Swiss-Prot record:
This is A-type ATP synthase subunit F. GO terms for cellular component: plasma membrane. GO terms for molecular function: ATP binding; proton-transporting ATP synthase activity, rotational mechanism; proton-transporting ATPase activity, rotational mechanism. InterPro entries: ATPase_V1-cplx_f_g_su, ATPase_V1-cplx_fsu_bac/arc, ATPase_V1_fsu_sf.
Length: 103
């Protein structure tokens, strides 16, 4: 199964260096966001893709992400950090493993 990353150039370069199988770079233009939307649809149809990593900012621009069981779609922060903040992450961890994270 392949891991694919979609996002800004800095994020994509980092994941390429880490050995991700496929990486797709997009900017903030409407044309680029439409290309990303089409690429996401294409990736969802492929049997060889197991995980799609997409930056939170790109996911926000694409709009609602499809709710599918497979491949797994994970939103990741970009170089500017998470747009959702720590509260969302804390809630996800609490629901996933039943442990409350405190600072």
């Amino acid at each position: 199964m392949k891991i694919v990353v979609m996002g800004d150039s800095d994020t994509v370069v980092g994941f390429r260096l880490a050995g991700v199988h496929e990486a797709y770079e997009y900017d903030e233009s409407l044309e680029s966001v439409e290309r990303a939307r089409n690429k996401l649809r294409e990736l969802l149809e492929r049997d060889d893709v197991g995980i799609i990593l997409i930056t939170e900012r790109l996911a926000q621009r694409i709009g609602s992400l499809p709710e599918v069981k497979f491949p797994i779609i994970l939103q990741i922060p970009d170089k500017f950090g998470s747009i959702y903040g720590e509260d969302i992450l804390r809630d996800v961890v609490r629901r996933a493993i039943g442990v409350e994270l405190k600072r």
